């Protein structure tokens, strides 16, 4: 795979640069589709698409096929491969009197598809065994996938976020992560123009939303944003940790009026809780049961629009007199709709126990190992509306 770790959309005349082509997704799924590729050059350039013998071919196209200076928004279009075998195209860049090539491979129908193709990179932990407080219970025989991304703070490698994956609806039923001043950070700033939307390397392009060219396309009059489950603003320690929040597996089609107002304020509220705690163990998720709506990703896949969103927060503070053994819990469950510009989160607050009943998910199963079953049960049963600290 030829990739670029961070691509800006600004073009220009780059003096004395080596001509290069960078393709984000290579090999390409049999289903084909569009993606951005980048060209690095300091003058006029052109791209020719050839087969392996140097002849023309028609199943790959590039637009524009010529230009001046570096560009990061060249559109590479690959048609669907109906054959069982893979096929290869040669992209030949001519610039500044030099030529360079990239071999683009498209998989055949025998090589693409299903959850059996999941490749978990070495070092991805077994979430049933890690014992992290934020990880929900994982039932035996589940059809969901479970993955975890890491980050490095200073010299310390730690977890960024973990998630379950619904291969049928193309969304994460839950995304779990620790939240504290330490891992939120405040070292970088993002501009909407340079948001690094990308596919998650744990899954094939066919198994997740492809959103790096543009946002969701609605099939109705409703407008959907690329809504984060782990917010980008929760990972501002460095670009590497923040980039991972833009993976398709962390994104759902979320109503713009919810994402940009009430939900954004709720995300800020959770960060404020973390800032006043040692650590908050957060689970953000969505429900798809009963949903009949979908939005289209950049290659036309139908991504289920969630019917509800929720947040579960387990707060720990060693110096608090609230809660039980330093822990207390709060959950918020929302229908997927417009809540206006308000911020009355208390109205939608419920206990962890109540959220478990609504979702069928066992939250914080590892808490009892730390503080005992009785204290853990009290944490999960506590009504957050009665605790002023949250509000």
For every predicted segment, state its role.
Residues 42-75:
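Surface-exposed binding patches on compact interaction domains or structured appendages
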Residues 11-14, 92, 104-391:
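Domain-level detector for secreted/extracellular nuclease and nuclease-toxin modules, and
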Residues 6-9:
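C-terminal motif of bacterial Sec signal peptides marking the signal peptidase cleavage site
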Residues 11-15, 22-52:
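Solvent-exposed, low-complexity, repeat-rich "mucin-like" stalks and linkers
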Residues 74-76, 84-97:
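A short beta-strand micro-motif common to beta-rich folds, especially ectodomain repeats
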Residues 32-36, 71-73, 99-101, 160:
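Intrinsic-disorder/low-complexity, polar/charged segments enriched in Ser/Thr/Lys/Arg/Asp/Glu/Gln
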Residues 31-37, 82-90, 156-158:
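Short, solvent-exposed loop/turn segments enriched in Ser/Thr/Gly
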């Amino acid at each position: 795979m030829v990739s670029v770790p961070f691509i800006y959309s600004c073009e220009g005349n780059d003096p004395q640069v080596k001509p290069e082509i960078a393709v984000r997704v290579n090999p390409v799924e049999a289903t084909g589709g569009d993606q951005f590729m980048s060209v690095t050059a300091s003058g006029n350039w052109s791209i020719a698409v050839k087969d392996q013998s140097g002849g023309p071919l028609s199943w790959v196209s590039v637009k524009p096929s010529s230009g001046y200076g570096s560009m990061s928004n060249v559109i590479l279009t690959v048609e669907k491969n109906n054959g069982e075998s893979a096929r290869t195209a040669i992209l030949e860049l001519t610039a500044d009197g030099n030529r360079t090539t990239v071999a683009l491979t498209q998989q055949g129908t025998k090589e693409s598809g299903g959850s059996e193709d999941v490749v978990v990179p070495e070092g991805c932990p077994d979430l049933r065994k890690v014992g992290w407080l934020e990880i929900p219970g994982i039932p035996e025989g589940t059809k969901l996938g479970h993955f975890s991304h890491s980050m490095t703070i200073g010299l310390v490698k730690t977890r960024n976020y973990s998630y379950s994956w619904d291969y049928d609806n193309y969304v994460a039923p839950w995304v779990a992560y620790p939240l504290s001043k330490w891992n939120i950070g405040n070292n970088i700033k993002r501009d909407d123009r340079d948001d690094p939307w990308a596919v998650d390397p744990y899954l094939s392009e066919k198994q997740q939303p492809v959103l790096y060219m543009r946002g969701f396309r609605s099939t109705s009059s409703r407008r959907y944003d690329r809504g984060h489950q782990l917010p980008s603003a929760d990972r501002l320690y460095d670009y590497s940790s923040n980039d991972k929040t833009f993976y398709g597996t962390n994104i759902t089609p979320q109503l713009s009026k919810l994402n940009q107002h009430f939900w954004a304020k709720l995300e800020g509220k959770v960060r404020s809780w973390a800032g006043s705690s040692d650590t908050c163990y957060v689970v953000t998720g969505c429900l798809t049961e009963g949903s009949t709506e979908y939005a289209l990703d950049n290659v036309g896949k139908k991504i289920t629009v969630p019917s509800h969103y929720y947040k579960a927060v387990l707060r720990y503070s060693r110096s608090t007199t609230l809660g039980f053994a330093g822990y207390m819990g709060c959950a918020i469950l929302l229908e997927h709709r417009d809540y206006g510009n308000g911020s009355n989160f208390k109205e939608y607050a419920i206990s962890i126990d109540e959220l478990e009943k609504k979702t069928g998910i066992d939250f914080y199963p590892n808490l009892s190992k730390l503080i005992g079953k009785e204290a853990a049960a009290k944490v999960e049963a506590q009504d957050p509306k009665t605790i002023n600290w949250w509000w």
